[in-house]
Amino acid sequence: MNDFKIKLGAINGGENCFSFEIKDQFFEEFTLSDVEYANVTATALLDKEGDRLALTLTIDGKINKLLCDICTDEISVDITAETKVIIKTTDEDLVSTDEIFYVKTSENAIDLKQLIFELIILNLPKKRQHALSKDGSSGCNKEMIELVNKYTVKEEKSSDPRWDALKKLKIK
């Protein structure tokens, strides 16, 4: 897909703004991702001053059909994030970092696909669950919660007698 490439020749001095729509087909190329459905807008603001090229990449939208960690129902998650990267052209094969994105001098475009993907994945919530309602109750599937509670094995805490003896010591 060439949809996420910005031609270096199209970048004028000053600020240049590019917008990309991230839909479901975007994630087909990334097989190890648990994100398959999305409606996200990515905005790339390129600021060119002489040879210096600074990129501010912003994403805003919704990731759909993620599974709730508690009840496994599908949920949608809002996502908003921003990152700033310096783009440098080089003749060498250098590995890009979080702060610097290297582009070969022979290339005529910057491919933002991987950067956009990483920004989305790294800004997903760690715990994915239904939002709590105003009264504090969960939006989780009640039938599934009942099944989870029914089949959850409660572990009894067994203590080591050696530690129990130490607990009896009183330190002044």
Predicted regions and their residues:
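A positional/architectural concept
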Residues: 1-68
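Cys/His-rich microdomains that often coordinate metals
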Residues: 75
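Short beta-strand edge segments in extracellular beta-sheet folds
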Residues: 84-88
